[in-house]
Amino acid sequence: MIYELNHVGGRVRDLEASLSFYDGLGAEVVDRLFMNNSRVHRVHLQVATGLVELLHHEASDPQATYGLNHVGFMTDDLDGDYARLMALGYGEISSPRVAGSGQGRLAFLSDPNGVRVELLQRSEEFRVPPITSGPVQGLSYVAVAAPDVDAAAEFYGTHLGMERVADDTFRLGADAVKLVPTAGSSIDHLGLTATEPAAEAQDPDGNRVVFLPAA
């Protein structure tokens, strides 16, 4: 069963610049490791209530695309959930395998609009209690591209088991996805609740961050 929206993640060009940006939002590093075989640095940051996964490859690649590019969900039955979603006709990206970190197993598929979705089964837990000492009080949502809103709603609501908390927003665990019909990229932006009004920002790889008033 899929039981948690765990993180949003992607590939970063300059790891230290990205860490500095999120540090300015009050984020804290909750996990950091180096995958020697692939020469990839992986960092999990917690931004208030939500996790952001940053992946930095030591080798340069002129063909690489940088920025947030997937949402990750936790499951207690990776093989079963993956097979079920494949039988429903969703696009295969990579079948279940041992994670490069050695921490559990993972698989990737695409939602109806081409957004990369990671399924994870592992015992490690990186999330810590909410970090609210900085300007950001919560990760309100991850905005994902949804030109076909109805198909996306069926995927996230019916087939991933997320709770529909608004017409365009689905929650599972602490975090939520918001469906954006006119998104500029697969992960359109992060919606963060903040103590003070602030202009929209961009991280070093061009990911948009929208600040929302805290309740």
Residue ranges and their predicted role:
Residues 1-16, 68-73, 120-153, 159, ...:
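N-terminal beta-strand motif that seeds the catalytic metal site of vicinal oxygen chelate
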Residues 2-3, 10-51, 80, 87, ...:
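Core segments of cupin and vicinal oxygen chelate
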Residues 14, 77, 111, 148, ...:
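Acidic di-acidic motifs
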Residues 28-63, 112, 116-123, 161-194, ...:
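Conserved short beta-strand elements that form part of the metal-binding/catalytic scaffold
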Residues 32-33, 82, 86-138, 144, ...:
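Vicinal oxygen chelate
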Residues 44-51, 55-103, 109:
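N-terminal accessory/assembly segment that mediates macromolecular interactions
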